[in-house]
Amino acid sequence: MICRFIDTHCHFDFPPFSGDEEASLQRAAQAGVGKIIVPATEAENFARVLALAENYQPLYAALGLHPGMLEKHSDVSLEQLQQALERRPAKVVAVGEIGLDLFGDDPQFERQQWLLDEQLKLAKRYDLPVILHSRRTHDKLAMHLKRHDLPRTGVVHGFSGSLQQAERFVQLGYKIGVGGTITYPRASKTRDVIAKLPLASLLLETDAPDMPLNGFQGQPNRPEQAARVFAVLCELRREPADEIAQALLNNTYTLFNVP
């Protein structure tokens, strides 16, 4: 099966994939999705994500502490991340999912920023790119990224900010994750941003099982839906479909060094 697409962000360690891995990967492959990057969200599931990557050839792992799960992260969690990265597992391709999130009544933003800084330091130490979560925090996140100046940079996944914010990330060397949001006609701002950014700055993703596509609301998202995201992306861009597909693959290989 030819790998036409890579889903650069899928939580394959979550239901509905748990216990259905073989069939889920087969469905993805039939849609042309030949490789999938699985970002961890907390130290408790590092072992699960690593085992998935080790046991299933299409899967690659990222390890990180998600800002939206702050109550689950302790200093010990950070030590566990460092220890896991120190072992340099062959199929760990990034630090993530990490970042900043201002959702909720008490986001503990100072602690979030400290945790982000510590994880950016680890990414730099172990020469890995980062997979970034950002909700209502694009400008602040860009400040942190500029200060740390990672040589391998990373991707801002699920981007839904302004063109100016996206261009700032791109100027810093970061990619922009393109997912199901662009399948919603009402998401005109995001669609316009993705249409205008350089093709070399884009990556394909689903964020499955979250972020269902337009027409699939209420259903778990799945990695094979990356093909539908790609189809909509082609409607928004001027380049030929084959050129877009090849660029997305090249961008992913370059950033994550996925073999």
UniProtKB/Swiss-Prot annotation:
CDD domains: TatD_DNAse (cd01310). PROSITE patterns: TATD_1, TATD_2, TATD_3. It comes from Escherichia coli (strain K12). One of its GO terms (molecular function) is hydrolase activity, acting on ester bonds. NCBIfam families: PRK11449.1. This is Uncharacterized metal-dependent hydrolase YjjV. Its EC number is 3.1.-.-. Binds 2 divalent metal cations per subunit. A divalent metal cation 2 binds at residues 97, 133, 157. Its cofactor is a divalent metal cation. A divalent metal cation 1 binds at residues 9, 11, 97, 207. The keyword Metal-binding applies. Belongs to the metallo-dependent hydrolases superfamily. TatD-type hydrolase family. InterPro entries: DNase_TatD-rel_CS, Metal_Hydrolase, TatD-like. It is an enzyme of class 3 (hydrolase). Keywords: Hydrolase, Metal-binding. The lineage of its organism: Bacteria, Pseudomonadati, Pseudomonadota, Gammaproteobacteria, Enterobacterales. GO terms for cellular component: cytosol. The keyword ATP-binding does not apply.
